[in-house]
Amino acid sequence: MKHEHLNLLAAMSLALAGMPMAAWAQPGTGKSVATAGIDTAEASRVTQTVDSRVTSTLQRTHLAIVDKATATKAVDDASPMNHMNLILQRSAKRQAALDALIAAQHDPSSSKFRQWLTPEQFGEAFGVTDADIAAVSAWLKSQGFTVNGVYANKMQIDFSGNAGQVRQAFHTQMNHYTINSASHVANASDISVPRALQSVVVGVAGLNDVRPQAQHTKPTYGRFNAGTQRFEVPQPKVAAMAPTPQAVNFTNGARGLVPYDMAKMYGTDKLYANGLTGAGITIALVEDNSMVPGDWSNFVSQFGLTSYGGTFTQLQPQATGFTNCIDPTIAAPGEDDFEALLDAEWSTAMAPGANIWLASCSDSNANNFFGGVFTAATNLINGTNRPNIISASYGYGEGFSDAASKTAIDLMWAQADAEGISVFVSSGDSGSNPSFNGFIINGVGVDANAFGTSPNDTVVGGTDTADILDGTTKKYFSSTFNAVYGSALSYVPEIPWNQSCGNEVAAKSLGYATSLAFCKAYLNFDPNGYYITSEAGSGGPSSVDAKPAWQRLVHNAAKDQSRDVPDVALFGGSYGGSTWVIVCSYYYPCTPGFTGPTALIGGTSLSSPMFAGIQALIDQGLAAKGLPASQGNAAPTLYALAMDEYGGSKGNPPATLAACNADNGAKGTGKCVFHNVTRGSIATQCVQQLPNVVTPDCYFYGALPNSWLGPIQVGLTTTNASKYNASTEAYAARPGWSFASGLGSVDANNLLTAWKAFVNVQ
């Protein structure tokens, strides 16, 4: 069932109508300006004797995918299960009060505008009562668990035990399963709790280890050719087996974009010239791995960013009274995690003066759904030292999450929003289902990133530069690098990032009338299915969270009741591997002139930290005008500004809808806040392995009896499996908002100007 969120963008007037002391959440600091006048007083909801013999089942507290898998064996009762989180349920009264407060915090006309909470104030007003927490904690201890502590938000109890205790207390068996060819641990059925506790407990986050994937492409390594100003990238061995129709002329190699290029494309160069670099703003990147700090220094030096004064800190965040974040130590100097590298280097690329925190916790210390990433994020949000901005480049579809894990994510981002933290999340890297990064959609239908479908974060999708497929590279890029290896001349037209034959722009560039015709022809070139892919920016509707009011009001907003993603998009990758960004790593350092092999990479794991960097520039610009630097969730303001530029959900759109079309490039878009991406789609290939796998939301156009996956049917993702066209493909770009690219990309300089006007400062 969808949770009804009342996050009305109030600025749009029509829309606003018995444990150790250290283990407990810290005491509240009293009423703040934000909570003044809000009635959240309530009595304990645990009013009956807690009897473990009288239980109630909590729905959706096991993974649905487990029902399709066969258990290989039971988990041994003595197997430890550390740092599980019991997720609590706030009352309807407090939920409504929180929704109203967050709306007011984003309303420039409200006395509560930008009046942010501390974690303690949040817990005092919107958490579960101390009496109810004591009742739940006492029951956990009676079952033999160790209660490690209660978070300041009074919504999470961290506890540890073993599989036998979980079976006995929650009436579910922990098993080993093989899911998507990987070994996992998960509970076999929904859990049960004493009926007396049912009203205050959602479930347990930590009963499975199906964790999300980092949303980046596999790194490619190229050698720089000074003659072509491109990187020569080795072709896969399978390419020699048959010619591929993806062989578009990519001008003798791959292009490696650098910070200068992104600054030109997205207008941050103008902000740098005015002294706005992100100085004084902190961006936290939540990770489950680490990197070599010297690689960040290498990146900053290579691309001329040192003088801006940004800083880099690698840390393990701990909430007050907790020690559950363990350092994911690098075993050897060269064992960089490319997710960490990409996030750290490219958030700095956009905000070269910002303070970058790489906040990482090891997965090995927790069984919970999002492992170290979840621990890092929730510890930051409940900690003493909090960032202005968080970027999370991880994801999995909602179909791969359980109710407790999804609720934990949503309450975490709502708390961040109420505290003023802006959260950005990658949409995913596999088209209409974000769970297949680096693989092919198989056995499931349309889905959305569970880590991003909260209405309290901003989801960032992926785009591709259109110049190569359009044959307009000379118009937008210089033929030679400048001193910092940049070549972009201006904004470059964008299309959705899509590396499959479902890319209509690529199909037409290759002479096909439609992507479907291209895909059918493709089968003749690829009888073994080596080039079948679902790699693309992701987007789709939530099956859990309801659409917030601010998302309904922009032109072409989906006419559904779901929280839809993405919200915005920035460069993520390229068709045919023609364009990537450069990262500097221990084994592949960046050298003057790129004399050695260089790492090239992409994904929405690039897009999210880049937008976080842009937000840092916005924050600094607003702080310079006397406003709080922290802005909370960016999405409500972004949609309000988009409504001005694209028009509302009713009536004729303004002339700026056409004027701000990304296809116009730099011509006529100089005053636009958004670049509206209107060509292409994120519809990708999907497969159905015969005879046992059923893949919904897939229009099948052919079969490969001898593919490397065995006999398969091959199709394109769609919202109607019986037909495939511009209306049914999942999903097409279009004017206004779309599942393919949200509101599009931004001009950061114009965004700051419009944001200032929105909050009534000059």
Q: Where do the protein language model's features map onto the residues?
A:
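Substrate-binding/charge-relay-adjacent region of secreted/lumenal peptidase catalytic domains
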Residues: 26-150, 158, 163-460, 509-510, ...
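Short glycine/serine- and small hydrophobic-enriched flexible loop segments
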Residues: 612-620
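Polar, glycine-rich mid-to-C-terminal structural blocks
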Residues: 436, 453-527
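Gram-negative bacterial Sec-dependent N-terminal signal peptides
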Residues: 1-25
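An often Trp-containing, charged/polar helix-loop segment at the C-terminal end
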Residues: 71, 489, 619-733
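Extracellular secreted precursors and ectodomains with disulfide-bonded cysteine-rich loops/domains
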Residues: 323, 499, 517, 582, ...
